[in-house]
């Protein structure tokens, strides 16, 4: 029987078993660390069906646990851990800040941020790590600008966010507690002295009007800050790797920048860094030739769904001309990633400027030597050394 989670050993290829899962059955039986059974969901049509099914819950007390250290967050609840209607109420309070129109107003600021980072990067002696010197500073500056979080605190919250995302690490809960305490203090400061950032606006328009509690705002500020910089940084780094492994595509994007939006969606589909979403059934669900029983755990394999040949054709290849907008890299349904429009814009601006300004960019290490992150639900690599 399959044991979950499964380690990934390649920076660009999925585990070979994923293709086998899609071919074998509607659902694949698996077990977690303590032997508890769960189901792996690997096919595109089934992933989408379950992510919109009201009989599937995100309640962390009912989901499969991935280690002895993996608890229910000790009462911590962001909107990502709540079912409707509570999830719906909270999401509506933040959704307008992440609309396509609102995010587009951030383009000049993001372009300014990326240009400044590239100026500093190009002043360094190569080889240079793309994650440390481009992707992470970019995503962190952007989310700090949006939320109104002091950028000078970045080392503190970057380290805690990374640790808090690791469900099998004993340091995860202490890191989460420190993040909550940090955002609690920041929200209290903004309550006394409101500003125009997203958190300050939420204080003025939501908290002080009684539409959201202090703790609800703090918990969702933790979510927005942590998810807002870590995921984008990893996705940008992997995207740079992929374009360097496909120099003809990088050249095509330099010559035809109008192709970048579709290239971004293909990169999202190709990598699908947020994999293995955990869910549980609250009632019996018939899916294909299987019946999921009430109480059964579910592991939703987004990356497998995004490589389903029945939906995407030659699923293992990277092709920026592929219609890829319907991928599920951001999830699907009511809990689909709130910041997807911002993530797309960050990728579009960062990748476009990087490959236009540094056309001679190349890898400074063997691809097979790249160190893949383990033990985290957010896939990535530890560093990406480049030269020019």
UniProtKB/Swiss-Prot annotation:
Q: Cofactor(s) for this protein?
A: heme
The annotated phenotype of a deletion mutant is:
Cells lacking this gene accumulate protomycinolide IV and mycinamicin VIII.
Which Pfam families does this one have?
A: p450
GO MF annotation terms: heme binding; iron ion binding; monooxygenase activity; oxidoreductase activity, acting on paired donors, with incorporation or reduction of molecular oxygen
Which cysteines are disulphide-bonded? none
- Please give the PROSITE patterns that the UniProt record associates with this protein: CYTOCHROME_P450
| Highest rank taxon of the organism | Bacteria
Q: Which InterPro entries has this protein been placed in?
A: Cyt_P450 (IPR001128), Cyt_P450_B (IPR002397), Cyt_P450_CS (IPR017972), Cyt_P450_sf (IPR036396)
What general EC class does the enzyme of this chain belong to?
oxidoreductase
Q: What is its EC number?
A: 1.14.-.-
Q: Which residues does the annotation say bind heme?
A: 87, 91, 279, 335, 337
A single GO BP term for this record reads:
antibiotic biosynthetic process
- Protein function: Involved in the biosynthesis of mycinamicin, a 16-membered macrolide antibiotic. Catalyzes hydroxylation at the C21 methyl group of mycinamicin VIII, the earliest macrolide form in the postpolyketide synthase tailoring pathway, leading to mycinamicin VII. Uses ferredoxin MycCII in electron transfer for catalysis.
By sequence similarity, the record places it as follows: Belongs to the cytochrome P450 family.
What is the protein's name according to its record?
Mycinamicin VIII C21 methyl hydroxylase
């Amino acid at each position: 029987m399959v044991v979950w989670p499964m380690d990934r050993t390649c920076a660009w290829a999925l585990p070979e078993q994923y293709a086998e899962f899609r071919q074998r059955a509607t659902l694949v039986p698996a077990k977690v660390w303590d032997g508890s059974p769960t189901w792996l969901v690997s096919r595109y049509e089934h992933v989408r069906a379950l992510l919109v099914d009201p009989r599937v819950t995100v309640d962390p007390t009912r989901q499969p646990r991935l280690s002895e250290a993996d608890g229910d967050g000790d009462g911590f609840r962001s909107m990502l851990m709540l079912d409707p209607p509570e999830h719906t109420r909270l999401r509506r309070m933040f959704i307008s800040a992440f609309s396509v129109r609102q995010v587009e107003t951030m383009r000049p600021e993001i372009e300014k941020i990326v240009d400044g980072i590239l100026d500093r990067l190009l002043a360094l002696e190569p080889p240079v790590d793309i994650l440390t010197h481009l992707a992470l500073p970019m995503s962190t500056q952007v989310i700090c600008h949006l939320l109104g979080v002091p950028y000078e605190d970045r080392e503190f919250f970057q380290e805690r966010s990374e640790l808090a995302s690791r469900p099998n690490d004993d340091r995860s809960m202490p890191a989460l507690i420190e993040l909550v305490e940090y955002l609690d203090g920041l929200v209290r400061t903004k309550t006394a002295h409101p500003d125009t950032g997203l958190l300050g606006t939420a204080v003025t328009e939501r908290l002080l009007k009684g539409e959201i509690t202090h703790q609800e705002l703090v918990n969702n500020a933790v979510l927005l800050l942590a998810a807002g910089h870590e995921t984008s940084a990893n996705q940008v780094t992997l995207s740079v790797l992929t374009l360097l492994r496909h120099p003809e595509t990088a050249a095509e994007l330099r010559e035809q920048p109008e192709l970048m939006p579709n290239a971004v969606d293909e990169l999202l589909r190709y990598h699908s860094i947020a994999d293995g979403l955990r869910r549980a059934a609250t009632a019996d669900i018939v899916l294909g030739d299987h019946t999921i029983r009430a109480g059964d755990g579910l592991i939703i394999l987004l990356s497998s769904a995004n490589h389903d040949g029945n939906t995407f054709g030659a699923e293992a290849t990277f092709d920026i001309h592929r219609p890829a907008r319907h991928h599920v890299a951001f999830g699907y349904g009511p809990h689909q990633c709130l910041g997807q429009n911002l993530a797309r814009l960050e990728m579009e601006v960062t990748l476009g400027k990087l490959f236009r300004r540094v056309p001679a960019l190349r890898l400074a290490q063997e691809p097979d030597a790249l160190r893949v992150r383990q033990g985290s639900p957010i896939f990535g690599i530890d560093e990406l050394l480049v030269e020019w």
